[in-house]
Amino acid sequence: MVELKEPFATLWRGKDPFEEVKTLQGEVFRELETRRTLRFEMAGKSYFLKWHRGTTLKEIIKNLLSLRMPVLGADREWNAIHRLRDVGVDTMYGVAFGEKGMNPLTRTSFIITEDLTPTISLEDYCADWATNPPDVRVKRMLIKRVATMVRDMHAAGINHRDCYICHFLLHLPFSGKEEELKISVIDLHRAQLRTRVPRRWRDKDLIGLYFSSMNIGLTQRDIWRFMKVYFAAPLKDILKQEQGLLSQAEAKATKIRERTIRKSL
């Protein structure tokens, strides 16, 4: 299966896209045995390529023993991108996808997305909030937007599996006005797609988002604000119905604090 949008539909017409992908040169972000990620220029624009070259038997066994489906190609990210865009969640724009082969050990696939630039990850944008607090209105605006995005992502049957603030990109310029605000969720190659996200995987995403935000100076009130938007329910109901989630999040936070203290000794 191959799906090409412009400019690749024109540039690669009559050519083998899998051979063309091999010739792409650019800034390599990740080079693994079975996956390559690079940023390259084409027709005056910047793009990201993720090229999957099968997987290893060791990786398949490791994931199955952990009761997880291994990532076997680029199709997850391609499908997740399109489902998110269908439900109005800002994300990457996919311009090319290809997949061939039935054997998971040798299957080859690729995905090309537009480079989202200029942007800054929320991890970097919020890095100094603990010592240099932002405008309260801006902070609440960002919390509301991320909570809405994650809620809509889960409602669409998608859980991210790497749901951290570094994977939410704030589009620039942003001066604090709501009409300028745009945030895109990225790195969906491990995402899972179903008709409904199981509670276990929902909680993993929420806990990941929580502990990746622990060092940016958020208050307890900020966390409650996020939860009220995400669950679309009164706080007293959330505290009653989500005791398991809250306990897991606090246990995770405690482990991180203890590990940080040990490393500083």
UniProtKB/Swiss-Prot annotation:
Sample GO molecular function, one term: ATP binding
Pathway of action: Bacterial outer membrane biogenesis; LPS core biosynthesis
The entry's keywords: ATP-binding, Cell inner membrane, Cell membrane, Kinase, Lipopolysaccharide biosynthesis, Magnesium, Membrane, Nucleotide-binding, Transferase
EC nos: 2.7.1.235
pH dependence per the UniProt record: Optimum pH is 8.0-9.0.
Disruption of the gene: reported phenotype: Mutation of the gene results in loss of phosphoryl substituents on HepI and prevents WaaQ and WaaY activity.
This protein's GO CC annotations: plasma membrane
Catalysed reactions, semicolon-separated: an L-alpha-D-Hep-(1->3)-L-alpha-D-Hep-(1->5)-[alpha-Kdo-(2->4)]-alpha-Kdo-(2->6)-lipid A + ATP = an L-alpha-D-Hep-(1->3)-4-O-phospho-L-alpha-D-Hep-(1->5)-[alpha-Kdo-(2->4)]-alpha-Kdo-(2->6)-lipid A + ADP + H(+); L-alpha-D-Hep-(1->3)-L-alpha-D-Hep-(1->5)-[alpha-Kdo-(2->4)]-alpha-Kdo-(2->6)-lipid A (E. coli) + ATP = L-alpha-D-Hep-(1->3)-4-O-phospho-L-alpha-D-Hep-(1->5)-[alpha-Kdo-(2->4)]-alpha-Kdo-(2->6)-lipid A (E. coli) + ADP + H(+)
Oxidoreductase in keyword set: no
Pfam families named in the record: Kdo
EC class of the enzyme, as a word: transferase
Cofactor(s) recorded in Swiss-Prot or TrEMBL: Mg(2+)
Active site: 162
Membrane topology listed for this record: Peripheral membrane protein
Compartments, record wording: Cell inner membrane
Major subcellular site: membrane
GO biological process terms, semicolon-separated: lipopolysaccharide core region biosynthetic process
Family, as annotated: Belongs to the protein kinase superfamily. KdkA/RfaP family.
General function of this protein: Kinase involved in the biosynthesis of the core oligosaccharide region of lipopolysaccharide (LPS). Catalyzes the phosphorylation of heptose I (HepI), the first heptose added to the Kdo2-lipid A module.
Protein name: Lipopolysaccharide core heptose(I) kinase WaaP
Organism, as annotated: Escherichia coli
